[in-house]
């Protein structure tokens, strides 16, 4: 059986970089990437960033006390469009970590061209109660040391 691997990101100069190829399904009637899809690309990069740190999000969902990160706030600035077949780089950098939250700065680039910037705040919550929880120390150490 052929082994299939997921797209790999990489750490470089304190940031995590994840590649995204633009497919026809990502574009709108005007032939450019539909604006909401940039949030999907950013989510994929954040997920792979956490995975690259050795953290499986599924473990938090299967634990007795289910917990995980949810988006609390997002600011996005669209500077230039991406189009079909572009290969983009989505970066993820932790800029602030609090007791129960973290702020990340993300950039989406095509080569050297900056297309989109995103600043996003995530909060660690108990999934059943939807209440904030302190980020576990071992997880906090991993995300601050990235």
Residue ranges: model-predicted function:
Residues 2-48, 52:
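Catalytic strand-loop segment that frames the active site of acyl-thioester-processing enzymes
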Residues 2-10, 16, 81-84, 95-146:
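HotDog/MaoC-like acyl-thioester-processing domains
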Residues 16, 31-32, 67-69, 133:
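Residues that recognize and position ribonucleotide moieties
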Residues 20-24, 78, 124:
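Hydrophobic residues in beta-strands and at strand termini
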Residues 22, 64-65, 130:
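Residue-level signal for pocket-adjacent positions within structured domains
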Residues 37, 43, 69, 127, ...:
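Short alpha-helical segments used as structural interaction elements across diverse proteins
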Residues 45-47, 73, 131:
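Hydrophobic alpha-helical segments, especially transmembrane helices
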Residues 49-89, 93-96, 101-102, 115-117, ...:
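Hydrophobic beta-strand-centered segment that forms part of the acyl-chain substrate-binding groove
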């Amino acid at each position: 059986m052929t082994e299939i691997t997921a797209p790999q990101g990489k750490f470089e100069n304190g940031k995590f970089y994840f590649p995204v190829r633009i497919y026809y399904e990502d574009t709108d009637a005007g032939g450019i990437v539909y604006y909401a899809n940039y949030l999907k690309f950013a989510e994929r990069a954040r997920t792979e960033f956490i995975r690259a740190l050795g953290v499986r999000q599924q473990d938090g969902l299967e634990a007795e006390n289910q917990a995980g990160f949810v988006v609390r706030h997002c600011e996005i600035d669209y500077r230039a469009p991406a189009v079909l077949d572009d290969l983009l780089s989505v970066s993820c950098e932790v800029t602030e970590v609090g007791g129960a939250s973290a702020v990340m700065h993300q950039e989406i680039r095509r080569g050297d061209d900056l297309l989109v910037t995103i600043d996003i705040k995530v909060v660690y919550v108990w999934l059943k109660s939807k209440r904030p929880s302190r980020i576990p120390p071992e997880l906090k150490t991993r995300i601050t040391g990235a």
